[in-house]
Amino acid sequence: SAQALDKLVEDRKREGSKIRKIIIAKLNLIEKLVLKVKKIMPLAIKSHQDKIKAKFNAALIDVDQDRLKQEFLFFVQKGDVEEELDRLVAHTSELRRLLNKSEPVGKKIDFLMQEFNREANTLGSKSISINISKISVDLKVLIDQIREQIQNIE
């Protein structure tokens, strides 16, 4: 009947609204974690630089400053996660945009979550600090939680 169909549509809208709120709360946490990485990155780089210097000193190697700079630049490039952080910010903006659409977006969000996961994995693999590694794991947990929620939307 028309009433039953209207009720079903209304129930689905209400459920969609609840899921949207849950996803937005998770997105807010993702954004906070990204900001946290950006904030601790300079200290992590400095700490990593100090470790490299200490290793050279411990080995009692008389290394010229150019060689030390080359080694340091190599490790900084390996640990540079700015691109991944920028992409995570872009993905959060895109997900917010999709959540505000009235058309079905489940498949698009699912694809976007794969991109989120890729960035979180790269962040973890490039990590030069335990704190950044932990944040990477926290990001993956939040991404998984969002993916679970989108299984319930169209």
Model-found features: residue ranges?
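N-terminal intrinsically disordered, cationic/polar leader segments
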Residues: 1-154
